[in-house]
Design a protein with these regions (language model features):
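Catalytic cores of phosphodiester-bond-cleaving enzymes
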Residues: 2, 52-133
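Short, well-structured alpha-helical interface segments that form or flank functional binding sites
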Residues: 17, 63, 117, 186-189, ...
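Short alpha-helical interface elements
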Residues: 33-36, 47-48, 92-96, 100, ...
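Glycine-rich loops and low-complexity Gly/Arg-rich segments
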Residues: 43-44, 92-95, 227-229
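Generic structural signal of hydrophobic/aromatic residues within well-ordered alpha-helices
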Residues: 32, 38, 71, 75, ...
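Low-complexity, polar-biased intrinsically disordered regions enriched in Pro/Ser/Thr/Gly
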Residues: 43-49, 53-54, 97-100, 176-183
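An N-terminal structural lobe/cap that precedes and organizes the functional/catalytic core
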Residues: 1-77
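C-terminal, charged low-complexity interaction regions
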Residues: 131-264
């Protein structure tokens, strides 16, 4: 196979790129994958003409050549193993502890996971799925991920939300600019979405005070130390609202012109 060279989405250096599995291979990503990207789902001409969406068949699992060897090795050693434990625990709960057809969510109670490592793996995957030019703009996120001991994360500029998927889906949107109406004013909201069965994530840039419907804000874990175990008791919603299969305008409708919980 020909070597692939380009800009590493994490360190920013021009180097030979290695294949970054998104999600990690042992997190339900070992077999051939059918990947749906944001570029395809927002092909308005195709949608108007009623044409079928085109999937990318990936023989070695979902992912792409986005990280240099050093960054791939480091993040794999530092973060991926903990994310795999987390994703597999969620998968076990969904398939063995609830009725997936009737349950609306799960309750997670654990003190055995290093959530800072999980968060940094999530951010590394976002960087790998974001368009190369955009990835370089997130220098603060890249520096946070590159330093395993860093606890400095700008939670005013970014919010990371999580939800659970009922059906199998591997898809990612890249950075989307959505036109939303807020109190009569039209604003552009930038988000990135990853559906990595059994978990989905949304990264918001310059988030509003309102959380996204049916998601759990996990940004607070960014301030944990690398070796810090955290007792986590949280509820995660099972939803298909942010599936890229049916995304279109639902996100816009449900997250525009909403009141905060206090009615303001």
């Amino acid at each position: 196979m020909d070597k692939k060279y380009g800009i590493c989405h994490l360190c920013g250096k021009y180097a030979e790129l290695t294949f970054e599995h998104v999600p990690p291979k042992s997190a339900n990503n070992k077999k051939r994958a059918k990947l749906l990207t944001g570029r395809e789902i927002f092909d308005t001409k195709k949608l108007r003409e009623g044409k079928s969406l085109k999937y990318i068949n990936q023989q070695q699992g979902a992912g792409n050549y986005t990280l240099c060897q050093e960054c791939n090795n480091n993040t794999g050693d530092w973060y991926a193993k903990e994310y795999i434990k987390f994703a597999n625990e969620i998968g076990y709960l969904l398939t063995n502890k609830i009725d997936i057809n009737s349950a609306k969510g799960i309750w997670l109670d654990t003190n055995k996971l290093y959530f800072q490592r999980i968060i940094k793996q999530i951010l590394c995957m976002f960087l790998s799925t974001i368009q190369p030019g955009y990835a370089m703009e997130f220098k603060d996120i890249r520096e946070y991920v590159l330093n395993k001991n860093s606890t400095e994360f700008n939670n005013k500029k970014y919010r990371i939300s999580m939800y659970l998927l009922k059906n199998y889906e591997i898809s990612h949107s890249g950075i989307l600019g959505l036109l939303l109406k807020d109190n009569g004013e039209t604003k552009i909201k930038e988000v990135a979405i990853m559906n990595l069965y059994p978990i989905g994530f949304i990264l918001e840039i310059d988030p509003s005070e309102k959380n996204i419907y049916d998601t759990t804000d996990i940004t607070k874990f960014t301030t944990l130390k690398y070796d810090e175990l955290q007792n986590v008791v949280m509820t995660f919603t099972i939803t298909e609202k942010y599936s890229l299969h049916n995304f279109t305008d639902r996100f816009i409708k449900e997250n525009s012109n909403r009141s905060d919980n206090n009615g303001k």
